[in-house]
Amino acid sequence: MIDARYLGDYKVWLEFNDGRKGVVDLSDELHGEELEPLRNRDRFSEFYLDYGLASIAWLDGQDFTPEFLYDKLKAMN
């Protein structure tokens, strides 16, 4: 992943290094104890691009694997 931008309503525009890009909706993925705090839209919007993980992450340690996001992007677009 080389770029990520928050669009609102848990939607994130992603770009991967192979040229694939598009929008993923993560609203249905925020379940479980670790991800529950991200249901707060303000908190969700504070993700950053972690170049070590090649994915988006949050300061409290939550993240999605790049493979998961790539597959979700392929399925949505």
Descriptions of predicted regions:
Residues M1-N77:
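Motif-centric detector for short Cys/His coordination patterns
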